[in-house]
Amino acid sequence: MKHYSIQPANLEFNAEGTPVSRDFDDVYFSNDNGLEETRYVFLGGNQLEVRFPEHPHPLFVVAESGFGTGLNFLTLWQAFDQFREAHPQAQLQRLHFISFEKFPLTRADLALAHQHWPELAPWAEQLQAQWPMPLPGCHRLLLNEGRVTLDLWFGDINELTSQLDDSLNQKVDAWFLDGFAPAKNPDMWTQNLFNAMARLARPGGTLATFTSAGFVRRGLQEAGFTMQKRKGFGRKREMLCGVMEQTLPLPCSTPWFNRTGSSKREVAIIGGGIASALLSLALLRRGWQVALYCADEAPALGASGNRQGALYPLLSKHDEALNRFFSNAFTFARRFYDQLPVKFDHDWCGVTQLGWDEKSQHKIAQMLSMDLPAELAVAVEANAVEQITGVATNCSGITYPQGGWLCPAELTRNVLELAQQQGLQIYYQYQLQNLSRKDDCWLLNFAGDQQATHSVVVLANGHQISRFSQTSTLPVYSVAGQVSHIPTTPELAELKQVLCYDGYLTPQNPANQHHCIGASYHRGSEDTAYSEDDQQQNRQRLIDCFPQAQWAKEVDVSDKEARCGVRCATRDHLPMVGNVPDYEATLVEYASLAEQKDEAVSAPVFDDLFMFAALGSRGLCSAPLCAEILAAQMSDEPIPMDASTLTALNPNRLWVRKLLKGKAVKAG
């Protein structure tokens, strides 16, 4: 059985209060002065005090082979903040730290270890507040208002480095080669790791490690680093430092899924919902000049305009990409929303998904068999459902304790206001008719003979994304749906969690004393007119799922209060995020892809044209991480996702999968 949780560190604290691994019989940091050793070995060994002021780019990337207690990261973060305070006009503005950890500490052990360094407390408290649950893969933490990014990869580093996307090659400015001593943990210190470090290192990048072991030095030299010994810290005689003095060839394992960014930093975003709002923030944080064109007279009038939307992950035992993406997207979304400096109605009250028939019970049983962390999802028996949700259903299910609901419309509006304060320009009632290349830019033609020219364009306009010649063949479809707004009752007022069944029901919003119940589903429709049939069907589905519940029968939809919207979806339930693929060129270039993979060129795409679409009914869960992925790709920065899952988000995926099998591809 595949496990979807990570085993925590098995440790104890010695007489000095230093954490010691029981499995590796080694300390996490020196009993003497771990903080000073970190400064000497890793910051000094990589000459960061000198390199920070001279760095020619706005971002400095550090990678590390063992996160442990986070001492190296916290020490570096402190030094980076001190550098920024002393050099506010320096080119270097942001720090990106990538670390791999097979056995992460629990939050409690992390906090206990951090008591060793009171001077690091301001930084340690921020790390503890965002410490992720033990799920495999990449967890992105945005710290210090986004000026510091931490990518925590949970799992075996030798496995994870082989799963990294090619876009991370030659991105690392400095390596911290840390971990338990080679004699204690020989499985980590492999030639495979050294080769991966060399592949990821930028030409001119450096490394430092506490060990001076000969096989480590020789392995790093074989990988491509120029190595030298340096005086060790304290009682240690020697340590190793290295430089990547050559430019290694860049491998591309799957060119048909290759992602390209842009050398430009000026962009137009087409849309007015949660996708365009969150992407605007992510790009502004990276120094982009951003303009947003919305077809409506105000934001969030489309699919992002609902009063309440549920936040919980979409899990699947049989779809690895779906499971990996949504579990990590959900945890990122919670961290993101919790630190977002805007107000919006929400309640992280939990979400319970109920097994109301044999099929749904089987699906839930499969999810519960995946060894998920209890922080993510737990089983709940029928007799306990009433206790945790407040209403009787006679159904068992699965509870997502960190889930809940939020107001998408308010979130979108307030995020855009925040983005405007940071420089976003918004143009309302600009309906894009078509776009074309002109002099290395994109010419945008709007209704009413309005025009604009921009270096880069992102299409984030929901179900209308396929209305342009460049996107008309995308395999996406529209789904119209109606959400009913129902007044509360004494029984409904007791509802404490979001209920999911063959529909969903939210607790009442204190702002209006109403609940949301929905939603109808009409594939291929873009009709947003009120439907009395849909209103009654929303009520009837609730009754059918809980036939013994009197409170369900008392739901009143007679006041005809509802909201109709149209979503954009795909048949594999995953978003489309990345370069807009060139359909005609893809068919020509990849006509013989199944037989000629070794000769494949990079994926044919439209230059400087990107898309952020097909969020379906899970946009509140997926949009924050998708915005971060796309902004990182566009900016040529590290992307917080493994290669196979990124492949599953690529807009060309459905075409390429068929071509790889030698099958014909049809548009749409």
From Swiss-Prot:
In residue numbers, the region (tRNA (mnm(5)s(2)U34)-methyltransferase) covers: 1-245
Query: Is Cell cycle set as a keyword in this record?
Result: no
Known catalysed reaction(s)?
A: 5-aminomethyl-2-thiouridine(34) in tRNA + S-adenosyl-L-methionine = 5-methylaminomethyl-2-thiouridine(34) in tRNA + S-adenosyl-L-homocysteine + H(+)
As recorded in UniProt, its EC number(s) are 2.1.1.61, 1.5.-.-
Q: Where is the protein found, in the record's own terms? A: Cytoplasm
Q: Does the keyword Oxidoreductase apply?
A: yes
Q: What's the chief localization of this chain?
A: cytoplasm
What keywords is this UniProt entry annotated with?
Cytoplasm, FAD, Flavoprotein, Methyltransferase, Multifunctional enzyme, Oxidoreductase, S-adenosyl-L-methionine, Transferase, tRNA processing
Q: Which InterPro entries match?
A: FAD-dep_OxRdtase (IPR006076), FAD/NAD-bd_sf (IPR036188), MnmC-like_methylTransf (IPR008471), SAM-dependent_MTases_sf (IPR029063), tRNA_MAMT_biosynth_bifunc_MnmC (IPR023032), tRNA_MNMC2 (IPR047785), tRNA_S-uridine_synth_MnmC_C (IPR017610)
Q: Name one GO biological process term.
A: methylation
User: What NCBIfam families does this protein's entry cite?
Assistant: MnmC_Cterm, PRK01747.1-1, PRK01747.1-2, PRK01747.1-3, PRK01747.1-5, tRNA_MNMC2
Reported function? Catalyzes the last two steps in the biosynthesis of 5-methylaminomethyl-2-thiouridine (mnm(5)s(2)U) at the wobble position (U34) in tRNA. Catalyzes the FAD-dependent demodification of cmnm(5)s(2)U34 to nm(5)s(2)U34, followed by the transfer of a methyl group from S-adenosyl-L-methionine to nm(5)s(2)U34, to form mnm(5)s(2)U34.
Q: What's this protein's family per the entry?
A: In the N-terminal section; belongs to the methyltransferase superfamily. tRNA (mnm(5)s(2)U34)-methyltransferase family. In the C-terminal section; belongs to the DAO family.
Q: What protein name does the entry list?
A: tRNA 5-methylaminomethyl-2-thiouridine biosynthesis bifunctional protein MnmC
Species name:
Shigella sonnei (strain Ss046)
Gene (name only) = mnmC
